[in-house]
């Protein structure tokens, strides 16, 4: 069976595991998480990210919160004269925006983990960099296009590959917005 969930925002990993257990989620099933497992609550989703590293039947699709974290990965660089010189007003603005969107709790959890296991933080950042922006899947005989937010400024006939990354993570669609018949998608 295929499962889809989104916007966990720091939901405790223990509760997510309990939810999956109640749904009888097993190794023959597949879970898509439509972004935003991090920020705002608890450990900032770091527990979920660590769990994701070892889950072959779970795929995180990049959300805007993961994208904001990746835009702040300069925080995990070694501190050198060059990195200090490169810390400019643009980076301060990027960090400030992320903090305003609930990123503090995630940054604090990752900073703590970085002291204990910098390799794990590097693995998490690598994992996030490799997350897809979307997936086309078939479940129950129906085709679905999965992404975090819809498709910003959608145009019928436009190839999916012609949209910028932000189109899949920053859109604010209405519930009744229709995009396309999946059989007509040109990826």
Placement of each model-derived feature along the sequence:
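A basic- and aromatic-enriched beta-loop-alpha substructure that forms the phosphate/nucleotide-
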Residues: 58-115
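Acidic, His/Gly-enriched loop-helix segments that form or flank divalent-metal centers
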Residues: 100-185
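Divalent metal-coordination and catalytic microenvironments
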Residues: 7, 36, 63-64, 106, ...
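A general structural motif
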Residues: 1, 26-28, 55-57, 141-142, ...
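Short, solvent-exposed loop/turn segments at secondary-structure junctions
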Residues: 9-10, 39, 66-67, 150-154
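Short amphipathic alpha-helical segments and helix-helix/interface helices
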Residues: 49-53, 125
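N-terminal active-site segment of His-dependent metallophosphoesterases
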Residues: 1-49, 186
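Short glycine-/acidic-enriched loop or helix-start segments at secondary-structure transitions
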Residues: 42-44, 70-72, 156-157
């Amino acid at each position: 069976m295929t499962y889809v969930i989104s916007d966990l925002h720091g939901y405790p990993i223990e509760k997510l595991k309990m939810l999956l257990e109640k749904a009888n989620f097993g190794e023959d099933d597949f879970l898509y998480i439509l972004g935003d497992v991090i920020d705002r609550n608890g450990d900032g989703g770091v527990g979920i990210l660590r769990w994701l590293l070892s889950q072959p039947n779970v795929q995180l699709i990049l959300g805007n919160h993961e994208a904001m974290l990746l835009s702040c990965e300069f925080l995990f660089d070694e501190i050198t004269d060059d990195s200090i010189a490169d810390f400019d007003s643009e980076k301060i603005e990027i960090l400030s925006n992320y903090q305003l969107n609930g990123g503090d709790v995630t940054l604090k959890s990752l900073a703590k983990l970085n002291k204990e296991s910098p390799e794990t933080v590097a693995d998490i950042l690598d994992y996030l960099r490799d997350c897809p922006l979307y997936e086309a899947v078939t479940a129950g005989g129906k085709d679905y296009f999965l992404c975090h937010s819809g498709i910003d400024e959608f145009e019928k006939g436009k190839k999916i590959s012609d949209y910028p990354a932000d189109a899949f993570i920053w859109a604010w669609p209405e519930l009744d917005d229709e995009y396309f018949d999946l059989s007509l998608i040109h990826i």
